[in-house]
Amino acid sequence: MFMPPVFPAHWHVSQPVLIADTFSSLVWKVSLPDGTPAIVKLKPIEDIADELRGADYLVWRNGRGAVRLLGRENNLMLLEYAGERMLSHIVAEHGDYQATEIAAELMAKLYAASEEPLPSALLPIRDRFAALFQRARDDQNAGCQTDYVHAAIIADQMMSNASELRGLHGDLHHENIMFSSRGWLVIDPVGLVGEVGFGAANMFYDPADRDDLCLDPRRIAQMADAFSRALDVDPRRLLEAYAYGCLSAAWNADGEEEHAI
Protein backbone atom coordinates (compact mmCIF):
# COMPACT_ATOMS: atom_id res chain seq x y z
CA MET A 1 0.00 0.00 0.00
CA PHE A 2 1.34 3.42 -0.99
CA MET A 3 1.88 5.63 2.04
CA PRO A 4 1.10 9.33 1.62
CA PRO A 5 3.95 11.80 2.05
CA VAL A 6 4.16 13.95 5.14
CA PHE A 7 1.86 16.84 4.39
CA PRO A 8 2.89 20.33 5.58
CA ALA A 9 1.86 20.67 9.22
CA HIS A 10 0.37 24.14 8.72
CA TRP A 11 -2.17 22.69 6.29
CA HIS A 12 -3.76 20.78 9.20
CA VAL A 13 -5.17 18.10 6.88
CA SER A 14 -6.20 14.63 8.03
CA GLN A 15 -7.75 11.36 6.86
CA PRO A 16 -5.93 11.12 3.52
CA VAL A 17 -7.44 8.69 1.01
CA LEU A 18 -5.63 8.04 -2.27
CA ILE A 19 -8.18 8.56 -5.05
CA ALA A 20 -5.95 8.74 -8.15
CA ASP A 21 -2.61 7.21 -9.08
CA THR A 22 -1.62 8.03 -12.66
CA PHE A 23 1.56 8.50 -14.67
CA SER A 24 1.32 12.23 -14.02
CA SER A 25 0.23 12.59 -10.39
CA LEU A 26 -0.95 11.15 -7.09
CA VAL A 27 -4.12 12.61 -5.62
CA TRP A 28 -5.50 12.31 -2.08
CA LYS A 29 -8.83 13.40 -0.71
CA VAL A 30 -8.26 14.90 2.74
CA SER A 31 -10.20 16.69 5.45
CA LEU A 32 -9.60 20.25 6.60
CA PRO A 33 -9.91 21.10 10.33
CA ASP A 34 -13.59 22.03 9.94
CA GLY A 35 -14.34 18.74 8.17
CA THR A 36 -14.50 20.27 4.70
CA PRO A 37 -13.03 17.95 2.06
CA ALA A 38 -10.03 19.09 0.06
CA ILE A 39 -7.52 17.64 -2.39
CA VAL A 40 -3.77 17.17 -2.10
CA LYS A 41 -1.98 16.62 -5.40
CA LEU A 42 1.60 15.40 -5.78
CA LYS A 43 3.36 15.87 -9.12
CA PRO A 44 6.65 14.20 -10.09
CA ILE A 45 9.55 16.63 -10.07
CA GLU A 46 10.25 15.98 -13.77
CA ASP A 47 6.69 17.08 -14.63
CA ILE A 48 6.62 20.09 -12.34
CA ALA A 49 6.81 22.93 -14.91
CA ASP A 50 3.22 22.57 -16.13
CA GLU A 51 2.00 22.17 -12.57
CA LEU A 52 3.70 25.34 -11.36
CA ARG A 53 2.18 27.29 -14.25
CA GLY A 54 -1.17 25.74 -13.43
CA ALA A 55 -0.84 26.81 -9.80
CA ASP A 56 -0.09 30.37 -10.89
CA TYR A 57 -3.14 30.23 -13.14
CA LEU A 58 -5.34 29.16 -10.21
CA VAL A 59 -4.00 31.96 -8.02
CA TRP A 60 -4.77 34.41 -10.82
CA ARG A 61 -8.32 33.06 -11.24
CA ASN A 62 -8.93 33.27 -7.47
CA GLY A 63 -11.88 30.91 -7.66
CA ARG A 64 -13.54 32.52 -10.70
CA GLY A 65 -14.58 29.48 -12.72
CA ALA A 66 -11.77 27.37 -11.28
CA VAL A 67 -10.97 25.53 -8.07
CA ARG A 68 -9.15 27.53 -5.44
CA LEU A 69 -5.51 26.86 -4.64
CA LEU A 70 -5.41 26.63 -0.85
CA GLY A 71 -1.69 26.04 -0.47
CA ARG A 72 1.45 24.71 -2.16
CA GLU A 73 4.78 23.37 -1.00
CA ASN A 74 7.34 22.29 -3.59
CA ASN A 75 5.52 19.71 -5.75
CA LEU A 76 2.52 19.39 -3.40
CA MET A 77 -0.67 21.40 -3.86
CA LEU A 78 -3.65 21.74 -1.54
CA LEU A 79 -6.79 22.38 -3.57
CA GLU A 80 -10.47 23.05 -3.12
CA TYR A 81 -12.50 19.85 -3.51
CA ALA A 82 -14.47 19.98 -6.77
CA GLY A 83 -16.75 17.01 -6.22
CA GLU A 84 -17.02 13.84 -8.27
CA ARG A 85 -19.44 14.77 -11.04
CA MET A 86 -17.76 15.53 -14.38
CA LEU A 87 -19.10 17.08 -17.56
CA SER A 88 -18.74 13.66 -19.19
CA HIS A 89 -21.52 12.46 -16.89
CA ILE A 90 -23.80 15.10 -18.41
CA VAL A 91 -23.00 13.81 -21.89
CA ALA A 92 -23.94 10.27 -20.83
CA GLU A 93 -27.07 11.21 -18.88
CA HIS A 94 -28.50 14.26 -20.62
CA GLY A 95 -26.77 14.47 -23.99
CA ASP A 96 -23.95 16.34 -25.65
CA TYR A 97 -25.99 19.48 -26.38
CA GLN A 98 -26.55 20.21 -22.69
CA ALA A 99 -22.89 19.49 -21.89
CA THR A 100 -21.78 21.89 -24.62
CA GLU A 101 -24.01 24.66 -23.27
CA ILE A 102 -22.53 24.14 -19.78
CA ALA A 103 -18.99 24.26 -21.19
CA ALA A 104 -19.78 27.42 -23.16
CA GLU A 105 -21.18 29.18 -20.10
CA LEU A 106 -18.15 28.20 -18.04
CA MET A 107 -15.68 29.30 -20.72
CA ALA A 108 -17.42 32.67 -20.95
CA LYS A 109 -16.61 33.15 -17.27
CA LEU A 110 -13.16 31.57 -17.44
CA TYR A 111 -11.93 33.50 -20.48
CA ALA A 112 -13.59 36.86 -19.84
CA ALA A 113 -11.33 39.89 -19.95
CA SER A 114 -9.70 40.46 -16.57
CA GLU A 115 -8.29 43.58 -14.96
CA GLU A 116 -5.76 41.39 -13.16
CA PRO A 117 -2.44 41.17 -15.04
CA LEU A 118 -1.61 37.77 -16.47
CA PRO A 119 0.94 35.74 -14.50
CA SER A 120 4.35 36.00 -16.12
CA ALA A 121 4.81 32.23 -15.80
CA LEU A 122 2.06 31.38 -18.31
CA LEU A 123 3.46 29.67 -21.41
CA PRO A 124 2.92 31.43 -24.76
CA ILE A 125 0.73 29.35 -27.05
CA ARG A 126 3.37 29.50 -29.81
CA ASP A 127 5.82 27.67 -27.55
CA ARG A 128 3.19 25.01 -26.91
CA PHE A 129 2.92 24.41 -30.66
CA ALA A 130 6.67 23.90 -31.14
CA ALA A 131 6.28 20.21 -32.05
CA LEU A 132 3.76 20.99 -34.80
CA PHE A 133 5.91 23.74 -36.28
CA GLN A 134 8.95 21.45 -36.26
CA ARG A 135 7.03 18.60 -37.91
CA ALA A 136 5.74 21.00 -40.58
CA ARG A 137 9.28 22.23 -41.32
CA ASP A 138 10.50 18.65 -41.59
CA ASP A 139 7.71 17.77 -44.02
CA GLN A 140 8.30 20.88 -46.12
CA ASN A 141 12.03 20.16 -46.29
CA ALA A 142 11.14 16.68 -47.52
CA GLY A 143 8.93 18.18 -50.23
CA CYS A 144 5.68 17.00 -48.62
CA GLN A 145 2.57 19.17 -48.27
CA THR A 146 0.93 17.38 -45.37
CA ASP A 147 -1.86 18.16 -42.93
CA TYR A 148 0.89 19.18 -40.50
CA VAL A 149 2.07 21.87 -42.93
CA HIS A 150 -1.46 23.18 -43.48
CA ALA A 151 -2.25 23.17 -39.75
CA ALA A 152 1.01 24.96 -38.92
CA ILE A 153 0.18 27.71 -41.42
CA ILE A 154 -3.27 28.18 -39.88
CA ALA A 155 -1.90 28.13 -36.32
CA ASP A 156 0.79 30.67 -37.21
CA GLN A 157 -1.78 32.98 -38.82
CA MET A 158 -4.07 32.75 -35.79
CA MET A 159 -1.22 33.53 -33.41
CA SER A 160 0.13 36.37 -35.55
CA ASN A 161 -3.31 37.98 -35.95
CA ALA A 162 -4.57 37.50 -32.40
CA SER A 163 -6.50 40.59 -31.35
CA GLU A 164 -6.14 40.01 -27.63
CA LEU A 165 -4.24 37.53 -25.47
CA ARG A 166 -5.99 35.80 -22.59
CA GLY A 167 -4.96 33.38 -19.87
CA LEU A 168 -5.97 29.88 -21.02
CA HIS A 169 -6.61 26.76 -18.98
CA GLY A 170 -4.54 24.72 -21.41
CA ASP A 171 -6.18 21.29 -20.95
CA LEU A 172 -9.93 21.86 -21.03
CA HIS A 173 -11.94 18.70 -21.57
CA HIS A 174 -15.01 16.91 -20.23
CA GLU A 175 -13.20 15.30 -17.29
CA ASN A 176 -11.55 18.54 -16.14
CA ILE A 177 -14.89 20.30 -15.75
CA MET A 178 -16.46 19.39 -12.41
CA PHE A 179 -19.71 20.17 -10.62
CA SER A 180 -18.85 21.43 -7.14
CA SER A 181 -20.71 23.08 -4.28
CA ARG A 182 -19.95 26.36 -6.09
CA GLY A 183 -21.24 25.14 -9.44
CA TRP A 184 -19.20 24.12 -12.48
CA LEU A 185 -15.44 24.63 -12.08
CA VAL A 186 -12.30 23.61 -13.94
CA ILE A 187 -9.46 21.62 -12.42
CA ASP A 188 -5.90 20.74 -13.51
CA PRO A 189 -4.95 23.79 -15.60
CA VAL A 190 -1.68 23.90 -17.53
CA GLY A 191 -1.54 27.70 -17.75
CA LEU A 192 -1.07 29.17 -21.23
CA VAL A 193 -1.49 32.58 -22.81
CA GLY A 194 -2.96 33.01 -26.28
CA GLU A 195 -6.01 33.83 -28.35
CA VAL A 196 -9.21 32.78 -26.61
CA GLY A 197 -10.20 30.52 -29.52
CA PHE A 198 -7.37 28.16 -28.66
CA GLY A 199 -8.88 27.76 -25.20
CA ALA A 200 -11.87 25.96 -26.70
CA ALA A 201 -10.01 23.82 -29.24
CA ASN A 202 -9.61 20.69 -27.14
CA MET A 203 -13.37 20.42 -26.55
CA PHE A 204 -13.96 19.53 -30.21
CA TYR A 205 -11.86 16.38 -29.70
CA ASP A 206 -13.60 15.25 -26.54
CA PRO A 207 -14.87 13.00 -25.02
CA ALA A 208 -11.88 11.06 -26.31
CA ASP A 209 -13.78 7.77 -26.59
CA ARG A 210 -16.72 9.26 -28.52
CA ASP A 211 -15.73 9.35 -32.18
CA ASP A 212 -19.44 9.32 -32.99
CA LEU A 213 -19.55 12.83 -31.53
CA CYS A 214 -16.10 14.17 -32.36
CA LEU A 215 -16.41 13.30 -36.07
CA ASP A 216 -20.01 14.46 -36.47
CA PRO A 217 -20.12 17.63 -38.64
CA ARG A 218 -23.40 18.72 -37.03
CA ARG A 219 -21.89 18.47 -33.57
CA ILE A 220 -18.79 20.39 -34.67
CA ALA A 221 -20.96 23.17 -36.12
CA GLN A 222 -23.16 23.28 -33.01
CA MET A 223 -20.10 23.52 -30.75
CA ALA A 224 -18.57 26.26 -32.89
CA ASP A 225 -21.83 28.22 -32.71
CA ALA A 226 -22.21 27.81 -28.93
CA PHE A 227 -18.58 28.67 -28.17
CA SER A 228 -18.47 31.61 -30.58
CA ARG A 229 -21.50 33.18 -28.88
CA ALA A 230 -20.07 32.57 -25.42
CA LEU A 231 -16.61 33.87 -26.25
CA ASP A 232 -17.59 36.54 -28.80
CA VAL A 233 -15.30 34.95 -31.37
CA ASP A 234 -15.88 34.38 -35.08
CA PRO A 235 -16.86 30.69 -35.37
CA ARG A 236 -14.48 30.32 -38.30
CA ARG A 237 -11.56 31.06 -36.00
CA LEU A 238 -12.79 28.41 -33.60
CA LEU A 239 -12.92 25.89 -36.43
CA GLU A 240 -9.41 26.87 -37.51
CA ALA A 241 -8.26 25.75 -34.08
CA TYR A 242 -8.49 22.24 -35.56
CA ALA A 243 -4.73 22.76 -35.78
CA TYR A 244 -4.70 21.45 -32.22
CA GLY A 245 -5.51 17.99 -33.54
CA CYS A 246 -2.39 18.06 -35.68
CA LEU A 247 -0.38 19.27 -32.70
CA SER A 248 -1.56 16.30 -30.67
CA ALA A 249 -0.73 13.98 -33.58
CA ALA A 250 2.74 15.52 -33.84
CA TRP A 251 3.35 14.85 -30.14
CA ASN A 252 2.24 11.25 -30.50
CA ALA A 253 4.32 10.74 -33.63
CA ASP A 254 7.37 11.92 -31.69
CA GLY A 255 6.63 9.45 -28.90
CA GLU A 256 5.87 12.19 -26.37
CA GLU A 257 3.12 12.09 -23.80
CA GLU A 258 0.01 13.74 -25.17
CA HIS A 259 -0.56 17.28 -24.05
CA ALA A 260 -3.50 19.52 -24.66
CA ILE A 261 -4.34 23.15 -25.01
State each model region's role.
Residues 1-66, 180-183:
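Conserved NTP-binding catalytic cores of kinases and kinase-like/nucleotidyltransferase enzymes
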Residues 1-16, 54, 141-149, 219, ...:
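Regulatory N- and C-terminal appendages and interdomain linkers associated
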Residues 2-7, 115-170, 180, 229:
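An alpha-helical support segment within catalytic cores of ATP-dependent transferases
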Residues 26-32, 39, 69, 153-198:
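Active-site acidic catalytic loop and adjacent metal/ATP-binding pocket
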Residues 36-80, 85-110:
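A conserved alpha-helical element in kinase catalytic cores
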Residues 45, 76-96, 112-116, 130-141, ...:
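A glycine-centered beta->alpha junction motif in the catalytic cores
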Residues 179-225, 229-232:
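Active-site Asp-x-Gly
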